[in-house]
Regions:
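N-terminal auxiliary segments of SAM/dcSAM-dependent transferases
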Residues: 1-17
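Class I SAM-dependent methyltransferase Rossmann-like catalytic core
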Residues: 17, 21-47, 51-52
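Class I SAM-dependent methyltransferase SAM/SAH-binding core
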Residues: 62-117
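A conserved beta-strand element that flanks and buttresses the S-adenosyl-L-methionine
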Residues: 129
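A short, conserved alpha-helix within the catalytic core of class I
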Residues: 137-148
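Conserved beta-strand signature within the Rossmann-like core of class I S-adenosyl-L-methionine
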Residues: 153-162
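C-terminal alpha-helical "lid/dimerization" subdomain adjacent to the S-adenosyl-L-methionine
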Residues: 162-209
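Conserved Class I S-adenosyl-L-methionine
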Residues: 195, 199-235
Length: 235
């Protein structure tokens, strides 16, 4: 028996745009908790740290976090930058105005906008991060998102997502009770994992969408990251 199931779409309850705003916020709390305990935040910070090392020390950077949720990743980036005496202005983006408002306290700025039509000029953002959002889209729409990320990024794009695995499914299901996840979060979390990617799948999706060769790495907690630099083509 393979530990990597076939990729499947399933149905995440909170993908329904008519969902209750309070339930969505509760689910975002569960996502932030999962990011903390299962490595989603650490995986993104690992990549951000390497990008910061490539940029001049005195430079003020702009970071856009797409699908920011509660803004836990921008907040963690600011703490990381502060330890190295770096200054990073963070922008959290959510589709729903109510959720953007929730994220505002954790980011320098919060914006309600469509990730498929980002309201930013080309190459106007130094670092673009996108954590656990890509798997919500069918491949054609996911490619549009990746192209938008590449368009607005000046230095780097960092995508974090889930590695598809039966072990990850079992781990999430069992730990969700101890962490007191809402039942909707538990259901959607399992579906999210089954929508996740292998390293080869994610690299191919990015190359086909953007023409860039991403550095794709596994991370603890059945996570996967992909980082690429808009100025370098996949040649």
């Amino acid at each position: 028996m393979t530990l990597t199931p076939a990729r499947r779409r399933g149905h995440e309850m909170l993908d329904d745009p008519s969902h209750d705003a309070a339930l969505a916020e509760r689910s975002l709390h569960d996502v932030a908790l999962a990011n903390r305990w299962f490595g989603g935040r650490r995986a993104i910070l690992r990549e951000v740290r390497q990008v910061l090392a490539r940029t001049p020390a005195g430079m003020t950077l702009r970071l856009l976090d797409i699908g920011t949720g509660l803004g836990d990743i921008p907040a963690a980036v600011q703490r990381l930058a502060g330890r190295d005496a770096r200054h990073v202005t963070t922008i959290g983006l959510e589709l729903a105005p109510a959720l953007a408002h929730v994220a505002h306290g954790a980011c320098s700025h919060a914006v309600a906008a469509n990730a498929l039509a980002l309201p930013f000029a080309t190459a106007s953002i130094d670092i673009v991060t996108c954590s656990q959002l890509l798997h919500h889209f069918e491949d054609e729409t996911a490619a549009r998102l990746l192209r938008e990320c590449t368009r607005v990024a000046r230095h780097a794009v960092i995508v974090g997502d889930l590695r598809r695995s039966w072990v990850a499914v079992a781990g999430l299901w069992l730990s969700s009770f101890a962490l007191r996840f809402h039942p909707v979060s538990r259901h959607d979390g399992v579906v999210s994992i089954l929508r996740g990617y292998t390293r080869a799948e994610l690299a191919l999706l990015i190359a086909r969408a953007t023409g860039r060769r991403a550095v794709v790495r596994h991370a603890l907690g059945w996570r996967i990251t992909a980082t690429w630099f808009p100025g370098f083509n996949a040649t």
